[in-house]
A protein has these predicted regions:
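Thiamine diphosphate
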Residues: 1-174
């Protein structure tokens, strides 16, 4: 029989939310994506968190940087295609001014998500991230997700830079 902690960790999106709560994230900025729908509803219901819904990714990045500048621990929840479209803002704002932002990124267009219109974005994601110097890693589905989120958040803080954690459907979709 599983303990309640093991059950939460078994449901990876619950573990992500629990980790954000435990680490004291006060603001989450997002551009909606079908995988993110339910976790965003749950974040919006969290007493200690504010969910800000942006209309596009560069706006989300600017809001997240402003929130962080105001001293609030902030996370971005966006799709990988959204990060691709915020390239200039990422380089000239978030990286230039060393904002420690945790970016939880739904990784669309992978072999596990072979929707034809996502595949080109999936192929481009990691090469573009490397090209603009965006620190990132992919989650490991065989390891608990909570510590992976915590490690990514710690890296962003310690390195004073944005860090993108690329997440599969099982990590983020409720």
């Amino acid at each position: 029989m599983k303990t309640s902690t093991e059950a939460l960790e078994a449901h990876r999106p619950s573990a992500v939310l629990n980790t954000l709560r435990r680490l004291g994230f006060g603001t989450v900025v997002s551009v909606p994506d079908s995988w993110l729908g339910e976790i965003l509803i749950r974040i919006d219901q969290e007493p200690g968190m504010t969910l800000v819904r942006a209309t596009h990714e560069e706006e989300a990045l600017a809001i997240a940087c402003g929130s962080r500048l105001g001293g609030v621990r902030t996370a971005l929840l966006v799709q990988n295609a959204g990060v691709l479209s915020m390239g200039a803002g990422m380089v000239s704002l978030a990286q230039r001014y060393q904002f420690p932002l945790l970016m939880l990124v739904s990784y669309r267009g992978t072999p596990d998500d072979p929707v034809f219109y996502h595949v080109p974005k999936g192929r481009a994601t990691e090469p573009v991230f490397r090209g603009i110097g965006l620190a990132h890693t992919c989650t490991d589905r065989y390891r608990p997700i909570g510590p992976q989120v915590e490690h990514a958040a710690t890296y962003a803080e310690e390195a004073s830079c944005p860090f993108a954690l690329l997440m599969g459907r099982e990590d983020i979709q409720w």
